[in-house]
Structure formats: C-alpha cells, structure tokens
C-alpha cells in the first residue's frame, strides 16, 4: 500500500495535480456498504480516502456526520469491525486509507497497539481532530516508527507561529480547516482560506489539504485555484451515501466523486 506522502509526491510529479480525498463514516448504512463504497471511491477518482471511525462524542463533526456516526454505532459498529473491513478491502485499493478517529479510542487501546494494528490492516494515515499540537508527540514518534503518517489540523484562527509549528510536525500533509466550527456543507467558501494558504506557503512546502465545508465541484475548483494540494469532502459524500438504498447511495457517491475530480483536474 502506497503511503500518503508518496501519493502526494506522485501527484506533484504529474503536472502538480490536486488530490481528491473523500470521507465516509464506517458502518453507515452498514459495513458491507462501507467496503463497497471504498472500492467505488477508489475507482471514481479518489487519490486517498478518509474513513471515519464512529464515535459517541464527535466534537468536530457537523450534523450530517454526527447522524451517520449515530446510525453506525446503533448498528453495533466497533473499531475492531471497521479494521476488519480495512483489512479486507485495502489490498484492492490504489488509494491509501486515512483513518479519522478521536483520541479516546486510541488511548483506551494503547497508542502503540492501536498504531500497529491499523498499519497491519492496511491504513497508512491518521487524523485525530481532538489532539492538540501540545500533546501530539505521544502519537507522532511511534506513528513515524510504525509507518503511519499523523496529519495535524490548522484552524482558521491559528496565529502564524502556531501554523509554523504544526506544519513542522504534521506528517503526510497538513489539514487546513476552512471554517471555524464543525464539519458540514457550506454554500460558499470563505476567502480567508486563500489568505491562510498563502501564509502556510511562507512556512512550509509540505502538501496542504483543505476540508470542512466543501460540498460542490465549483468550491473544490476554487480551493485548488487558491493553491491547495488536496480537497477533502466529507458531509456531501456521507449525505449522498445515506440517501435511498445502499445501491443508490453507492451510485450517487461514485458520480459525485467523478464530478469533483473532473472539476479539479
């Protein structure tokens, strides 16, 4: 399985293409559909895929992803069952899987045990939205040793010195949160994102991915034009997958992913 860094390097060497990173919640509507969705996204233009592990107190998630997590947990989804899906599907994918999970489940299982397990099943990246920079060392070093790239988040309110510190520590890429607040679909992208991207370019040459609020191909293109190396789309994908039957949802996310990819390429 290719690493997140290698994926970005390949894209940069190929006419500086912008990466598409869709997000889905594992277990919504069920784990069988999650497995199929990973394959659909992989062949529909995704360069990497974020897979959200459902959690009972998802502080960073907006209403669409919160509802998906609740449905998934109510069906009995656990971290272990999610990792079984990753283990089954990851060998079939060209896109590396980035797990999105909160810190408490990691702490509960033990940092090294968790990291080794997710690496062994095929995940290559990790995003922990409630892990502050000041506590990131507990994950960064063991993750690096094991082969998991821990991506840190930059908030739109972050001062320049903090951006610099996060950029220095983040692995794989840097996740720029486009709006204050939780995930979710927005009608317009804030022009503040353009300024933040410019600020970040002054302190790092690492890839930057923009997420939270992108719901339309036109917004994805705008973010690319502002200089982002990746576009991360979550709620709009989760919403489409949840609507109608599982087969209808899979068809919808495949078409949406293709439209997003066409816009940014």
From Swiss-Prot:
Its EC number is 4.2.1.20. It is an enzyme of class 4 (lyase). Gene3D superfamilies: Aldolase class I. One of its GO terms (cellular component) is cytosol. It comes from the Bacteria. It catalyses: (1S,2R)-1-C-(indol-3-yl)glycerol 3-phosphate + L-serine = D-glyceraldehyde 3-phosphate + L-tryptophan + H2O. One of its GO terms (molecular function) is tryptophan synthase activity. The active site is at 50 (proton acceptor), 61 (proton acceptor). Pfam families: Trp_syntA (PF00290). Signal peptide: none annotated. InterPro entries: Aldolase_TIM, RibuloseP-bd_barrel, Trp_synthase_alpha_AS, Trp_synthase_suA. Keywords: Amino-acid biosynthesis, Aromatic amino acid biosynthesis, Lyase, Tryptophan biosynthesis. Pathway: Amino-acid biosynthesis; L-tryptophan biosynthesis; L-tryptophan from chorismate: step 5/5. Belongs to the TrpA family. The alpha subunit is responsible for the aldol cleavage of indoleglycerol phosphate to indole and glyceraldehyde 3-phosphate. HAMAP family: Trp_synth_alpha. Tetramer of two alpha and two beta chains. This is Tryptophan synthase alpha chain. It comes from Trichodesmium erythraeum (strain IMS101).
